Amino acid sequence: MNKSQGSVSFTDVTVDFTQEEWEQLDPSQRILYMDVMLENYSNLLSVEVWKADDQMERDHRNPDEQARQFLILKNQTPIEERGDLFGKALNLNTDFVSLRQVPYKYDLYEKTLKYNSDLLNSNRSYAGKQTDECNEFGKALLYLKQEKTHSGVEYSEYNKSGKALSHKAAIFKHQKIKNLVQPFICTYCDKAFSFKSLLISHKRIHTGEKPYECNVCKKTFSHKANLIKHQRIHTGEKPFECPECGKAFTHQSNLIVHQRAHMEKKPYECSECGKTFAQKFELTTHQRIHTGERPYECNECAKTFFKKSNLIIHQKIHTGEKRYECSECGKSFIQNSQLIIHMRTHTGEKPYECTECGKTFSQRSTLRLHLRIHTGEKPYECSECGKAFSRKSRLSVHQRVHIGEKP
């Protein structure tokens, strides 16, 4: 590509966060950011290295020596001992240290290099720049490949070009970029994605495509992961084992629910019903069931709640907000927990097991109702005749007899 066509700089493929914004990202978002950024840099480098090589030949320099100078980190072993990184496109899987093995902070630069790309931004346009600028990028790149701090290299070595790397605040640029690079746009709803594979999966919500079929019952799925989960129903496979008691489960979520029984200590006991809780505030909230206290009121409809979280969830009914969308059928929900329960209709997952008969259920509430068969509990009593029922719905049906309404 000649210069008249324009060149792509590292800045063009860079997304930066302020320190405050970075601290708000959770670990999975940070890893995704690094996945995107390192892929961008490696792709750009694979193109720009050749441009640099052509430039060196035009300048009658020694290409091998220039390449060596570009990629060698000062005071480290020669590039020949590190493998042939020059002369081929860098491979994200082999030429960079695994992102999940790199800590979120390096000791370098007063522990402020939090996966930010400012080390690379000093090279505004790679092609045609001086060798020392190339070396600066090479140093930063190889630093990622090392799994330890280069204690033999002074801080000043990284600041030769006088770029904004000399103090802590300069590590984070003042851009207000809120989202990661998302170049793949859905033509149906304009939702954006970082990777093409995610866009392809998402489009199945609109097209209804379900390319993954169970070879036992012929049920189809839009995602392979859901098919794999579903097939465990047929195979009986239980890959998730509790390290405490050895009990195995079909799905990881089943194991997580089970492990709570081992992990939780519940020293706070309700004097009314004997139920125990891990924290005192949970007991206080629970006791409102017995006292009837409902301190949280909806300003739209005046409905009251004994938990603030229940009020917040309820208010979404008025706003119409449904943030959680099913990737299988596109149905959306107010709460993430509702989506999780709904997804089990697609996967067939039933994480709640009856300890009496082994029957499994997709919802905890359904298990509770089922347990009354074994315990004989009938908490719903007719005020007219005293007959008791295990379920409120059955009491409602029964009461129609007294008022003359046909069930």
Swiss-Prot record:
It is found in: Nucleus. GO terms for cellular component: nucleus. Residues 8-83 form the KRAB domain. It comes from the Eukaryota. This is Zinc finger protein 1 homolog. Pfam families: KRAB, zf-C2H2. The gene is ZFP1. Belongs to the krueppel C2H2-type zinc-finger protein family. The keyword Transcription applies. One of its GO terms (molecular function) is RNA polymerase II cis-regulatory region sequence-specific DNA binding. The keyword Heme does not apply. InterPro entries: KRAB, KRAB_dom_sf, Znf_C2H2_sf, Znf_C2H2_type. May be involved in transcriptional regulation. Keywords: DNA-binding, Isopeptide bond, Metal-binding, Nucleus, Repeat, Transcription, Transcription regulation, Ubl conjugation, Zinc, Zinc-finger.
